[in-house]
Amino acid sequence: MKTYLLLILCTCTLIASAQPPTIYKTTTLEIDSITPGTYVHRTYLSTKDWGLVSCNGAVYTNKGESVVFDTPATDSVSLELISWIKTHTRSCIKAIVVNHSHADCLGGLAVFHKVGIPSYSSKRTQTFAGNDTVNKPVVPQHGFTKELELKIGGTSIINYFPGEGHTQDNIVSYIPSVKVLFGGCIIKALGSGKGNLAEANINAWAESVRNVKQKFPDAVIIIPGHGAYGNRSLLDYTIQMFGK
């Protein structure tokens, strides 16, 4: 166990030192370039139980088209992100993919709809968002059950429901051309804790991540919902955290 923890700490240090430089930064939005045309957007969500939480999303651009994975939590920061994409990448945003029904995934969805960007999620996310009478989130427009392929500049984007984990509706999104997996909150950053378990299925979580690992064996860069992105060790770390 001590050896495993030492390996995790060493890996965290290596990944932290290898993180690409931030190419855009304001008090509300940070953007890292992780491959040519692939970016992590990092924003902040104010929570009652956890304070100010850093949240990851992603952007992929190809041949003048782009897709966004998860919105910032607010309309204003979502507008800032959309503006940056249009100005910096000079691409047309063809889709926003929502990972699950929490605010760190769809809090700014109204802005995307307002400017004509179609949204996609699992059908479960549509149901949970539609039934949330407390927060009353905007509901994604298009839903799928198990898997959805989108085309961005002719390149495939695979959106996949691996099973329950952080929530009952969490999905992952894979970009084969750059071998980047946006795992969202079902994937934990190295060294992180279990996080928000209010709607989690902790008994299914490890098996769901095993499904991700098996489905996308070529994924090289893994982006969690919170914390530092890294390599496939994030999958193993999450499996061990929730494994029996």
PLM feature segments, named:
Residues 45-48, 66, 73-76, 101-105, ...:
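Solvent-exposed loop/turn segments at secondary-structure junctions
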Residues 1-20:
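Bacterial Sec-dependent N-terminal signal peptides
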Residues 42-55, 131-132, 192-200:
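Acidic/histidine-rich helix-loop elements
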Residues 63-67, 76-120:
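Active-site metal-binding motif and surrounding structural segment of the metallo-beta-lactamase
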Residues 22, 26-29, 34, 65-67, 73-74, 123-238, ...:
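Metallo-beta-lactamase
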Residues 35-82, 172-185:
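Conserved beta-strand hairpin/beta-sheet module of binuclear metal-dependent hydrolase folds
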Residues 37, 60, 70, 85, ...:
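Divalent metal-coordination and catalytic microenvironments
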